[in-house]
């Protein structure tokens, strides 16, 4: 067991709080719903980047390479100034939704290079131009571009020409859970000496301005010579920031500069932007001469030669200066400082070596490690008391005279105040429940406890609606997202069991009870006609459909969604898996297995049995489509070949016979149910038909349908890209689908890159690109089919190639293609970086990896949010899975038997 594993164990057993401090600062608090108190709900305009340096936040904080405690009481981050910018670089810059041609977009280069799960060691890289940062150029040029044009990026502005920039590395190393060493290494990559002001900044989140019962905390300088900032908070206690070298300490308050923001006199001359005004604007009286406040920075003025590196060292600790006196040989920056940093770095190497498959080469190991590091850096303290927020904006739902709230007034029960895995801490600095389910798959690779805690969090009464709905995201908690929580729950349970030798049954039981509420909400709310056909609404695939699926249809009527119904079939299967696992040790759950067996039969048959002309399955095309049901009773398939039609393939789960052997009445009652309804058995895969080792398969598709869908999916002219499965078939490049509603045209074409519409904000595209989470679900399903059919079912992969594979091999081939987006090819290039030569060839860029939101459907280049390691980080789990699974042993033992075998090896 490595040192990091021991720390995880100590934290789990609550002996030492190794996770108390971490990268829990957001990278963008401005422009969020939480900070929006506007009449119309325009969060981007209400609180802008320009205001952020001067205006105190209500619900959280942000910063560069930020670090805080898990309640975000005390925050640390980096500020930089190159002597030319109009403002301090205190936070990342990006464009708002209306400023960019493809929606909101960060315009900086920064990388999450490393992190252990306890954050005992972390490493971050920020690339800072030596020329003035081109704020206005980025805004104006992007604003002038159309949706069919490329985005104007920071490299395009030429500020990195001749390598005139600084590489600023920030490392955190914990000597103890409360003693944190901070090392900032500044490299001048340019040809000439350049100056840089480095301002490590410590501040308290402003709670006192909003809550009258909160005692105001204090930062103050200790001693006349400086070098130490004392932080005192009634809840957190005392902390000390030790600053190496001769750096003056600058103090102000984390209070709004109301004069600048609102044109009203500020309560204090010392405000949030005072340090900026002191340094950039030369206002020497802007900072507090008494050396106290609630925000402070040490000012290091560096002159860095070409190719030179200079280091700034700090230490945030609960250890008082009196305990660091020379009498006991201690010093905040003595020999022990570097020893701790090197030791934690070495322990991080040992930790990742212990989980990295032996078959991985250095590049594969680097991809996996940086994917996980990005997941760990993307943790954020998320604070949002919706009831208080509504009250503060005059929208209290319990008062008759109230302002209308632009959103979330039905979620007034919610109180969020937790560290949560974010999709992207700049572009999506708020949790998204269905994204989170995929995050957990990667996070459990290194920290099963955190993964379990994240899944359970969404089911707690402070999050889940009393009616059973799981919250979507802050822009509209009531939106409908795919029900993947149960899948992530059973998957996590099995992964932990395989890793630790036993699964957490109590966690599984409590999760199951809450998931029952969510399942009931779905059945009651989303099945309009009580025919087990689900409309769904938004369902997370944004612009994939012919219409905006969360809005009323231009034709009237309603849409029966193939993916909505497939999601519910998968939800049934996952709940059946959980109930079956629990029934092995608790007979109370045996009855629940039958409940979900019957639910699955009804839902699965509804997809294929609604009628030859009006059902979702099209026999001629061998594919599933959404069905438009018009007010006059007519129905029409919307023949778009998209991920919508592949999702029914994903609703497949194999079961062994353990529960049936223990409770034979389940088989008897299920058989009676089917015997009385032969039309159901005829419409789906025969659930009574045995597969390998007498296993059973719950699947919407029988073998004939499966083969036809796979033939389309694995056709390189359709869905199979060199880098995974596309979200829309390439067939639509030359054959767009067109639908007319009156004189209004609706068109779906194959768009392999960015969206050409503003639907759902325009900052994502499901009409062609490759999306990692959907590929992960397809891979999961193929493994399920393999465990049932074994080597008896082989298909051409790619279609028409003559190369036949079983379905495990197909899953491995898709995973290989996905992995190849990030790995160097034979020419040393990473497809994810496309034609960006700096990323392809420069030794200071080429091994720094970004895990984008989605990827070009033809060439694999990264698109969308650049740091959505969130669900794209699942590539780490997929790479690991195919490097460690023995398919022959798994086929022989079965899914649960294989998990039990691995568990026996661990115990």
Explain the meaning of each model-derived region:
Residues 68:
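Active-site-proximal polar cores
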Residues 64:
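Basic, low-complexity intrinsically disordered segments
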Residues 1-55, 72-74, 81-907:
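Acidic, mature catalytic/reactive cores of soluble proteins
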């Amino acid at each position: 067991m490595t040192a990091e594993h021991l720390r995880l164990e100590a934290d789990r057993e609550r002996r030492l709080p190794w996770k108390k401090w971490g990268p829990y600062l957001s990278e963008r608090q401005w422009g969020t719903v939480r900070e929006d108190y506007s009449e119309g709900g325009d969060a981007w305009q209400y609180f802008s980047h320009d205001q952020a340096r001067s205006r105190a936040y209500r619900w959280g904080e942000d910063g560069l390479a930020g670090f805080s405690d898990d309640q975000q009481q005390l925050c640390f981050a980096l500020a930089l100034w190159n002597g030319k910018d109009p403002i301090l670089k205190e936070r990342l810059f990006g464009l708002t939704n209306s400023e960019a041609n493809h929606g909101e977009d960060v315009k900086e280069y920064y990388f999450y290079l490393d992190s252990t799960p306890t954050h005992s060691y972390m490493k971050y890289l920020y690339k800072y131009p030596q020329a003035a940062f081109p704020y206005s150029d980025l805004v104006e040029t992007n604003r002038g571009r159309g949706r069919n044009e490329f985005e104007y990026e920071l490299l395009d502005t030429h500020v990195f020409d001749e390598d005139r920039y600084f590489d600023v590395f920030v490392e955190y190393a914990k000597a103890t859970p409360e003693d944190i060493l901070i090392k900032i290494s500044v490299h001048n990559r340019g040809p000439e000496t350049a100056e840089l002001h480095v301002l490590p900044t410590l501040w308290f989140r402003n709670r006192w301005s909003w809550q009258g019962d909160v005692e105001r905390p204090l930062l103050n300088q200790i001693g006349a010579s400086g070098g130490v900032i004392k932080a005192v908070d009634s809840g957190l206690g005392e902390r000390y920031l030790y600053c190496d070298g001769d750096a003056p300490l600058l103090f102000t308050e984390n209070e709004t500069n109301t004069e600048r923001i609102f044109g009203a006199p500020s309560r204090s001359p010392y405000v949030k932007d005072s340090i900026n005004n002191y340094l950039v604007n030369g206002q020497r009286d802007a900072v507090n001469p008494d050396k106290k406040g609630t925000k402070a920075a040490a000012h290091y003025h560096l002159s860095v030669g070409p190719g030179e590196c200079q280091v700034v060292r700090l230490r945030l600790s609960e250890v008082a200066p009196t305990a660091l006196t020379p009498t006991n040989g201690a010093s905040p920056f003595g020999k022990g400082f570097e020893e701790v940093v090197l030791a934690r770095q070495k322990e991080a190497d040992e930790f990742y070596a212990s989980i990295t498959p032996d078959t991985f080469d250095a590049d594969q190991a680097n991809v996996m490690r940086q994917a996980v590091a990005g997941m760990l850096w993307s943790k954020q303290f998320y604070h949002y008391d919706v009831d208080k927020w509504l009250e503060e904006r005059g929208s209290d739902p319990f008062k008759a005279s109230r302002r209308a709230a632009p959103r979330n007034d039905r979620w007034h029960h919610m109180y969020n105040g937790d560290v949560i895995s974010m999709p992207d801490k700049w572009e999506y600095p708020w949790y998204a429940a269905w994204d989170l389910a995929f995050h957990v798959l990667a996070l459990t690779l290194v920290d099963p406890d955190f993964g379990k805690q994240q899944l359970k969090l969404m089911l707690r009464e402070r999050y889940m609606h009393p009616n059973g709905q799981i919250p979507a995201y802050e822009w509209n908690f009531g939106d409908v997202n795919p029900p993947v929580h149960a899948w992530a729950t059973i998957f996590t349970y099995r992964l932990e069991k395989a890793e630790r030798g036993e699964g957490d049954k109590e966690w599984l039981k409590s999760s199951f009870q809450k998931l029952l509420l969510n399942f009931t909400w779905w059945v009651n709310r989303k099945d309009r006609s009580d025919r087990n056909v689900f409309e769904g609404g938004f369902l997370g695939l944004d612009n994939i459909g012919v219409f905006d699926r969360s809005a009323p249809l231009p034709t009237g009527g309603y849409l029966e969604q193939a993916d909505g119904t497939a999601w519910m079939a998968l939800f049934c299967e996952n709940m059946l898996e959980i109930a079956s696992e629990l029934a092995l040790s608790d007979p109370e759950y045996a009855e629940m297995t039958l409940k979900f067996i019957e639910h699955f039969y009804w839902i699965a048959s509804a997809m294929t049995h609604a009628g030859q002309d009006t059902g979702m399955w099209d026999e001629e095309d061998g594919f599933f489509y959404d069905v438009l049901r018009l007010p006059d009773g007519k129905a029409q398939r919307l023949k778009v070949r998209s991920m919508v039609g592949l999702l029914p393939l994903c609703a497949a789960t194999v079961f062994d016979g353990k529960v049936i052997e223990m409770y034979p009445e389940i088989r008897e009652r299920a058989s009676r149910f089917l015997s009385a309804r032969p039309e159901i058995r005829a419409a789906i895969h025969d659930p009574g038909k045995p597969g390998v080792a007498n296993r059973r398969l719950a699947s919407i598709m029988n073998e004939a349908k499966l083969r036809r869908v796979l033939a389309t999916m694995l056709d390189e002219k359709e869905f199979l890209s060199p880098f995974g499965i596309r979200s829309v078939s390439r067939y639509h490049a030359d054959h767009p689908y067109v639908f007319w509603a009156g004189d209004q045209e609706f068109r779906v074409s194959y768009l392999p890159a960015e969206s050409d519409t503003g639907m759902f904000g325009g900052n994502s595209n499901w009409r062609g690109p490759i999306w990692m989470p959907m590929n992960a679900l397809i891979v999961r399903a193929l493994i399920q089919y393999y465990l049932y059919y074994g080597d008896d079912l082989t298909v051409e992969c790619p279609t028409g190639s003559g190369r036949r594979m079983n379905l495990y091999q197909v899953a491995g081939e898709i995973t290989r293609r996905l992995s190849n987006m990030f790995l160097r090819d034979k020419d040393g290039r990473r497809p994810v970086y496309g034609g960006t030569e700096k990323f392809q060839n420069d030794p200071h860029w080429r091994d720094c990896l970004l895990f984008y939101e989605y990827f070009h459907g033809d060439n694999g280049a990264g698109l969308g949010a650049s740091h959505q390691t969130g669900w794209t980080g699942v590539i780490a789990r997929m790479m690991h899975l195919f490097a460690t699974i023995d398919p022959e042993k798994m086929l022989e033992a079965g899914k649960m038997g294989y998990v039990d075998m691995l568990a026996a090896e661990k115990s």
